[in-house]
UniProtKB/Swiss-Prot annotation:
Protein name from the UniProt record: Hyaluronan and proteoglycan link protein 1
Cellular location(s): Secreted, Extracellular space, Extracellular matrix
Keyword Repeat: yes
Similarity comment: family membership: Belongs to the HAPLN family.
Native organism taxonomy: Eukaryota, Metazoa, Chordata, Craniata, Vertebrata
Primary localization: secreted
Purpose: Stabilizes the aggregates of proteoglycan monomers with hyaluronic acid in the extracellular cartilage matrix.
A Gene Ontology BP annotation from the UniProt entry: cell adhesion
Length: 354
């Protein structure tokens, strides 16, 4: 017991001797690090930025370092941008930078770079925006053991529209719904996009898939059997369903296009096959559903002539309601999916700009 007590006393004296040899400055460095917390701060001037398909955008991100912090400036700064999936379960790599080393991933190659406005600027520039670029992006800055992140949302100007194929309503599983939107120059809409469309007046009584795998529908005028007679307006949520087996419609989203949408002046009405050929003869292609909605919503296109579209449907866009032309509201009117051999309609064409 005496030997153990002597060992403890010697250890205490040796520790006191060591503490006398350490400078006050060293003690302060440790004290500041403990009390002041992290020495790397990442911020975004805007939580959300807006653009459109084909445009350019800067996702803001700046970082601030404490130059007095122990170890500051020793490590290279690593900047990493990722995109969050709509269900927030995964992150998709977009861009990584460390010193002179830079790497771009996937479809972002050749379209993204750091703004580089200053040594503390981690803002990311995305050029030639696509519909798939919409979403939330995370900026992460790492220096040694210190790191911080910020999330920036990229919103696109555009229009949400409900869609179902020739087979009729409630015939698409989730994967087919995704492809159906792509076939119409669109992507499957997010909940935020549907919610914004509902706030803008979209009222649709058929449930459709959204990008997060949920099934919902927007009601501005509750009625039976659309949301219930005595209920409040809102986006009705059916929840999450089996993506392979469950079948619903889909809500698609599209944005500006780089081309010309127009109704082809032709001496006669056309069958579907004749309509396709007529657009080709005019140096164009038969238009898609997403293009007629974009022309109507974004450009204010108005035409009171029913015309064929690429999916075999017949529609016409009205931005100025009037007698015999959607008198009650501005809308893209849906005639249906008639027999493709019927020679009763004109055609809407789309000519892309190079």
């Amino acid at each position: 017991m005496k030997s153990l007590l002597l060992l403890v006393l010697i250890s205490i004296c040796w520790a006191d001797h060591l503490s006398d040899n350490y400078t006050l400055d060293h003690d302060r460095a440790i004290h500041i690090q403990a009390e002041n917390g992290p020495h790397l701060l990442v911020e975004a001037e805007q939580a959300k930025v807006f653009s459109h398909r084909g445009g350019n955008v800067t996702l803001p991100c700046k970082f601030y370092r404490d130059p007095t912090a122990f170890g500051s400036g020793i490590h290279k700064i690593r900047i990493k941008w990722t995109k969050l999936t709509s269900d927030y379960l995964k992150e998709v790599d977009v861009f990584v930078s460390m010193g002179y080393h830079k790497k771009t991933y996937g479809g972002y190659q050749g379209r993204v770079f750091l703004k580089g406005g200053s040594d503390s600027d981690a803002s990311l520039v995305i050029t030639d925006l696509t519909l798939e670029d919409y979403g939330r992006y995370k900026c992460e800055v790492i220096e040694g053991l210190e790191d911080d992140t910020v999330v920036v949302a990229l919103d696109l100007q555009g229009v949400v529209f409900p869609y179902f194929p020739r087979l009729g309503r409630y015939n698409l599983n989730f994967h087919e719904a995704q492809q159906a939107c792509l076939d119409q120059d669109a992507v499957i809409a997010s909940f935020d996009q549907l919610y914004d469309a509902w706030r803008g007046g979209l009222d649709w009584c058929n449930a459709g898939w959204l990008s997060d795998g949920s099934v919902q529908y927007p009601i501005t005028k509750p009625r039976e059997p659309c949301g219930g007679q005595n209920t409040v307006p809102g986006v009705r949520n059916y929840g999450f369903w089996d993506k392979d087996k469950s079948r619903y419609d889909v809500f698609c989203f599209t944005s500006n296009f780089n081309g010309r949408f127009y109704y082809l002046i032709h001496p006669t009405k056309l069958t579907y096959d004749e309509a396709v050929q007529a657009c080709l003869n005019d140096g164009a292609q038969i238009a898609k559903v997403g293009q007629i909605f974009a022309a109507w919503k974004i450009l204010g296109y108005d035409r009171c002539d029913a015309g064929w579209l690429a999916d075999g449907s017949v529609r016409y866009p009205i931005s100025r309601p009037r007698r015999r032309c959607s008198p009650t509201e501005a809308a893209v009117r849906f005639v249906g999916f008639p027999d493709k051999k019927h020679k009763l309609y004109g055609v809407y064409c789309f000519r892309a700009y190079n």
